[in-house]
């Protein structure tokens, strides 16, 4: 999983209101050079959207995001999600994923939370909310004591700062919501999403 995410570099983070556009979304992201997406459990459509995305673009690394309960994790995996991402550490979710052999990326905001994940054998965690926590400065501070831990940074990431994040040795990838504007998704404007994905891909390739 880590190498797949490292190759993608930027994972689009998506709130989807209806499952219907998920197929076109997944194809547009792949065509734009970002074969990954984090579909968040912020709406009731999440599980069905994951199912549609996986069916339309089996080559895409489809994650479930904002997973707050083990039940949501189970729904996501049943729909085809390849990994579970959460904004914080819910050990119920972590333990369920580990028992099922499902990759899980819990959110961490403190050294203590990072160490809690390390005790579970996890070496990739989500730094969230990244910019509020200090962003690149925070990552540099964590690199010394936690040399064996890598991060997915999400929260406040934009085209203006994502390059600075990706240059950090302890960053695997960043999550970004700007690639899939809600208005474009609701309107089915996949050309706009494809273009934004290609622009993000160009940033990754320039690092």
Q: Predicted segments — roles?
A:
Residues 87-93, 126-135, 170-192:
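Glycine-rich phosphate-binding active-site loops on the catalytic face of alpha/beta enzymes
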Residues 74, 94-97, 115-119, 135-138, ...:
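Short, charged, surface-exposed secondary-structure boundary motifs
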Residues 15-17, 64-70, 86-90, 106-111, ...:
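Glycine-rich beta-to-alpha transition loops that act as phosphate-gripper elements at the mouths
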Residues 1-82, 99, 148, 159-160, ...:
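Conserved N-terminal beta1-alpha1 strand-loop-helix module at the mouth
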Residues 156-161, 178-180:
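Glycine-rich beta-alpha junction loops
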Residues 116, 132, 137-152:
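Shared catalytic-loop signature of beta/alpha-barrel
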Residues 38, 63, 85, 105, ...:
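Conserved beta-strand positions in the central sheet of alpha/beta enzyme cores
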Residues 90-124, 128-133:
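Histidine/lysine/aspartate-rich catalytic loop segments that bind and position anionic ligands
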